[in-house]
Amino acid sequence: MLHLSAAPPAPPPEVTATARPCLCSVGRRGDGGKMAAAGALERSFVELSGAERERPRHFREFTVCSIGTANAVAGAVKYSESAGGFYYVESGKLFSVTRNRFIHWKTSGDTLELMEESLDINLLNNAIRLKFQNCSVLPGGVYVSETQNRVIILMLTNQTVHRLLLPHPSRMYRSELVVDSQMQSIFTDIGKVDFTDPCNYQLIPAVPGISPNSTASTAWLSSDGEALFALPCASGGIFVLKLPPYDIPGMVSVVELKQSSVMQRLLTGWMPTAIRGDQSPSDRPLSLAVHCVEHDAFIFALCQDHKLRMWSYKEQMCLMVADMLEYVPVKKDLRLTAGTGHKLRLAYSPTMGLYLGIYMHAPKRGQFCIFQLVSTESNRYSLDHISSLFTSQETLIDFALTSTDIWALWHDAENQTVVKYINFEHNVAGQWNPVFMQPLPEEEIVIRDDQDPREMYLQSLFTPGQFTNEALCKALQIFCRGTERNLDLSWSELKKEVTLAVENELQGSVTEYEFSQEEFRNLQQEFWCKFYACCLQYQEALSHPLALHLNPHTNMVCLLKKGYLSFLIPSSLVDHLYLLPYENLLTEDETTISDDVDIARDVICLIKCLRLIEESVTVDMSVIMEMSCYNLQSPEKAAEQILEDMITIDVENVMEDICSKLQEIRNPIHAIGLLIREMDYETEVEMEKGFNPAQPLNIRMNLTQLYGSNTAGYIVCRGVHKIASTRFLICRDLLILQQLLMRLGDAVIWGTGQLFQAQQDLLHRTAPLLLSYYLIKWGSECLATDVPLDTLESNLQHLSVLELTDSGALMANRFVSSPQTIVELFFQEVARKHIISHLFSQPKAPLSQTGLNWPEMITAITSYLLQLLWPSNPGCLFLECLMGNCQYVQLQDYIQLLHPWCQVNVGSCRFMLGRCYLVTGEGQKALECFCQAASEVGKEEFLDRLIRSEDGEIVSTPRLQYYDKVLRLLDVIGLPELVIQLATSAITEAGDDWKSQATLRTCIFKHHLDLGHNSQAYEALTQIPDSSRQLDCLRQLVVVLCERSQLQDLVEFPYVNLHNEVVGIIESRARAVDLMTHNYYELLYAFHIYRHNYRKAGTVMFEYGMRLGREVRTLRGLEKQGNCYLAALNCLRLIRPEYAWIVQPVSGAVYDRPGASPKRNHDGECTAAPTNRQIEILELEDLEKECSLARIRLTLAQHDPSAVAVAGSSSAEEMVTLLVQAGLFDTAISLCQTFKLPLTPVFEGLAFKCIKLQFGGEAAQAEAWAWLAANQLSSVITTKESSATDEAWRLLSTYLERYKVQNNLYHHCVINKLLSHGVPLPNWLINSYKKVDAAELLRLYLNYDLLEEAVDLVSEYVDAVLGKGHQYFGIEFPLSATAPMVWLPYSSIDQLLQALGENSANSHNIALSQKILDKLEDYQQKVDKATRDLLYRRTL
């Protein structure tokens, strides 16, 4: 229930420092060489800063106002800054919501800053700042406890005590399964807290009153939920203030614990009622701690009189007093002075009981005493002294105690931070294990003449792990002298602001217009140096340590600093030996290195040699090796040059010392090989990917969040950077040492001579090792680039083409607010999931019982991450991650650094380098890389995965599959030239595989066509071995060239063995698409003309014309139809007469097209295809007719646009009707003559128009002129202006005179039309018809009951026969004995007489009848006379 930062309960003592694999002999890791004895080997630790390069942490500020506090006191009390931390009870359990979660805080004056951290998830709203009005927070006066539902924070100031209630994380989320990458902190809803609630705060009473100069305090929760605060009394002793449970009303009470008696004061209105004793203040507590047992609490007080007192709160009595000076060897001076600086810590183990750690401070020395609390049956207590540990460091800032270890934090005489730890049970020699602290950035930046000061300073300021964002922001604010600036800046924005600020200061100081380059450079360096010094000052201030935070559940140790949090991680054995001070190597336990003492001594001597070399290497020498790695030069030659320089400047005989140490090594070659093998992370088997599918889903999902926060990622990667940096130096010094060995030859070796070849082999093994660590170090410092969303989406599309989007290396990119290094990006996006799944794939114990041990976990994770980053290992997830997250520049640089010396994953690297070149627009370089990678297909895991198809089916050789993927990628990106080049290269690989050949040649064809390389496209098409693909490509060629109007190329290609196919394709297209927007018929016509196939050309154009008439009802369509028929006619005229014919396309036929739906009848059944169609042959004459008809259609459409819709497909007979309706009588007559049709419709139509004009108004007259003008009228001289009616009658007259036929059919039909409409016949028409057929005219009169006109006609006709006006009736010879016979239409005359006689009552009719009878009488007499004369003449 209760866990205090001062005395954290410890878990069972399992592992306090992780066991390391010991050095083994030369050869593979694990081969030969006996490991060191099993057990927990004590190692040094390394400090890693947890200050990410994010924006300064955003604190939400709240003011805590307490009624009754005095203003004067706040200003009078000055407390030092302090810090502390709290770990959740289940923070070490694998499936707890509070796993890897903790709270830490910092106090300064009236301010308390609280932060909640998690190594698994990113917590939101996790930082608050509380300001206590008129109060100062007691150093260490913050205590955090947790219950099942709540987290309770107890806070003490110099005037008040406070209780803050927050929800427990287990009650904040719906499920215990945490799967989100971001979650709310317990501080999220703190804005709802009422800090003035009297139930949760109270003033410290003036009596007994807090000791004015004391900072000791402790607080805890009772089993009943009461909040208790223990403080030193002003008069000595302790008083305890109790707040009732937050949910139960109650009184506040104060209990004063005194040596002589126990007095309790119930506080009512805070009036003092207790009696002061004469107690001396020498028993005033310097440090307080509490340990809860069931329903009691033991309060331990380390007092000024150097005594430890133990109080029972329940019994309110002192249970034990122990004089600590009894355990101090030199105590005379201490007994005479009051104690200062003593500190007390508790540690509880369920198995071992309660441990007390006491630090006794004395001038220039200090001592730790470890005790175990022992109780007897009679409830008496005593201390069992476990250990005393001495230290020479003067100023102890803080220490932490577990049931096995002490961790201590000092400031030494040079104000440097020192952290050490020791196992107080087993360490007989009292040897403290060091923690290698993170050094501050270099005080001075050395800039060579060839370097730009600004670039070098910016590089130093913004290199990951150097300066925190907060230090840079504060320096910027000071440097700009209070200028208003927005300091909520991202890393890149801050870099711009810094550059701008320094450059502005530089410009502002310039007073002259002209500078020499050297003067400007010096001035520039001065200002940058000034800003750098300012940053260094703030970084140093923020790095000031305040406290240690130790979690016994996970054995995680943190260092709480003024500006940030740092973590301590264990060193590997090699790093530990190399980083140890030289003097510590003298006392290093050899058994921790190897069970073989000789091997262990050789290794220690070797390390001593390396340390001597490291101390002799100057900054310039170090740069030589760095630059040789960066410039891809030989590390061996660089080491040789450094050795030469060391020998040259060796004034302290260091080389002699090294040679002396080498003499002590029994087997240098073996020792060096051992060291190399220990540092080599090369493996032959790639790490498994993904979680064990046998594990339940909830377990797998829970594990996916383990160490998933930005903080954890940053720490892990800083750990990798630290290892890589240290190992790089070790390898560098090893190379130098090996060069020295080469110089010395066999002289240095005792016993038998060593082979020169063995030395060479070691040299060639060390160089790749050094380059590997350099590459990892470089990646740990190289910042990732923030990528726009559209670039990520485009990249994802490209990767989907390669079917790589399901790869573990290519997850959705989610950049954090701060820039990451590419190694951080890799860990967070890819590696963490692989490592965690690997760690928990085969657990030794059930996962539910698995506890998290920080040293073990961080060691394993960094080790596996190094394995994944190791350049010579088979997998290349790191490169895939960079490629998947668009880190192309970084990927390019990485491969460039890797390429010359690493021959693993060469093909994969070339492929990814090709992807980089594609992005940067260097297509030819990309193509070269892709071709180079092809040779490695089948040899590398990444390339094998690249070519693996989704269905697992292998359709061609691996290399061809690779080419196929790359071709698809180039196609999606839109690089047809590269596609052609690569496909051409791949054809050679295809060999006799005709399917692959067809695919590749089709690809070449397609992209040549896209580029407009028509000839090359045709050539590629002719080489496609698959006829089906070839036909598809041919169809595409036709369509594309038509769309581009590149018809000449299309027509002129030879089409060897493809002639019928191309004709079929064009015909099919012609019949399938719109006639007016595509010109496939004209293309086909040109195609046949180019090949002199005129009959087919004519057939094509005739079909085109037919369809135009049927489908295109526009004037343009009719024009094209005429031209088509004319072209078809010309084609046939070019052929010999016997071959000048074509087969007429079936009118209205639907041509079969691919994909066309079958035709169905009304019942839905498919109609049977027509069979045995009759073939119609069209000859030249038929075409001429069609051509004439097409011209006439166009004429009609031009004259009458409304006729366009019906004219196109109309027959000749229908066209005559349309022309007559439109008034185009000349055209109609021409059409009738061409097609040998009667003119009857023309005359009837013209007669009808005359009738309409006769009775129409002016509108009809005006309209008539339009169609009259379209007919050729013979010019007639007239004395008066003719009307449209007159002109129409004249046109009719002209036609009747011009177009005469047998039986005078046209006169008959005209007169019949007129009479049928009751129109009187014009005289000219009557006279005209009398001349040709008077008898028929008579019959027409009778048909329409025109009796009077009939009588007149008969009278005139009889007179004409008898010789009077015979020329008007076309009678050449009238009646005479010498003339030919004449006749009268007696039948018609009889009908007339009968009709007149039918109405005998009508006198007019009787008169008319008599008139005819008289005429006939006269006629008959003259006939009789003429007959007699004729007979007479014959007799003569």
UniProtKB/Swiss-Prot annotation:
<dbReference type="Pfam" id="PF23347">
    <property type="entry name" value="TPR_Nup160_C"/>
</dbReference>
<feature type="modified residue" description="Phosphoserine">
    <location>
        <position position="1157"/>
    </location>
</feature>
<dbReference type="GO" id="GO:0072006">
    <property type="term" value="P:nephron development"/>
</dbReference>
<keyword id="KW-0225">Disease variant</keyword>
<comment type="subunit">
    <text>Part of the nuclear pore complex (NPC). Forms part of the NUP160 subcomplex in the nuclear pore which is composed of NUP160, NUP133, NUP107 and NUP96. This complex plays a role in RNA export and in tethering NUP98 and NUP153 to the nucleus.</text>
</comment>
<dbReference type="GO" id="GO:0015031">
    <property type="term" value="P:protein transport"/>
</dbReference>
<dbReference type="InterPro" id="IPR056536">
    <property type="entry name" value="TPR_NUP160_C"/>
</dbReference>
<dbReference type="GO" id="GO:0006406">
    <property type="term" value="P:mRNA export from nucleus"/>
</dbReference>
<keyword id="KW-0813">Transport</keyword>
<dbReference type="InterPro" id="IPR056535">
    <property type="entry name" value="TPR_NUP160_M"/>
</dbReference>
<feature type="modified residue" description="Phosphoserine">
    <location>
        <position position="44"/>
    </location>
</feature>
<protein>
    <recommendedName>
        <fullName>Nuclear pore complex protein Nup160</fullName>
    </recommendedName>
</protein>
<feature type="modified residue" description="Phosphoserine">
    <location>
        <position position="490"/>
    </location>
</feature>
<keyword id="KW-0597">Phosphoprotein</keyword>
<dbReference type="GO" id="GO:0006913">
    <property type="term" value="P:nucleocytoplasmic transport"/>
</dbReference>
<dbReference type="InterPro" id="IPR021717">
    <property type="entry name" value="Nucleoporin_Nup160"/>
</dbReference>
<dbReference type="GO" id="GO:0017056">
    <property type="term" value="F:structural constituent of nuclear pore"/>
</dbReference>
<keyword id="KW-0509">mRNA transport</keyword>
<dbReference type="GO" id="GO:0005635">
    <property type="term" value="C:nuclear envelope"/>
</dbReference>
<dbReference type="InterPro" id="IPR056547">
    <property type="entry name" value="NUP160_helical"/>
</dbReference>
<keyword id="KW-0539">Nucleus</keyword>
<dbReference type="Pfam" id="PF23354">
    <property type="entry name" value="TPR_NUP160_120_M"/>
</dbReference>
<comment type="function">
    <text>Functions as a component of the nuclear pore complex (NPC). Involved in poly(A)+ RNA transport.</text>
</comment>
<keyword id="KW-0811">Translocation</keyword>
<keyword id="KW-0906">Nuclear pore complex</keyword>
<feature type="modified residue" description="Phosphoserine">
    <location>
        <position position="949"/>
    </location>
</feature>
<dbReference type="Pfam" id="PF23345">
    <property type="entry name" value="NUP160_helical"/>
</dbReference>
<dbReference type="GO" id="GO:0005643">
    <property type="term" value="C:nuclear pore"/>
</dbReference>
<keyword id="KW-0653">Protein transport</keyword>
<dbReference type="Pfam" id="PF11715">
    <property type="entry name" value="Beta-prop_Nup120_160"/>
</dbReference>
<dbReference type="GO" id="GO:0005829">
    <property type="term" value="C:cytosol"/>
</dbReference>
<dbReference type="GO" id="GO:0031080">
    <property type="term" value="C:nuclear pore outer ring"/>
</dbReference>
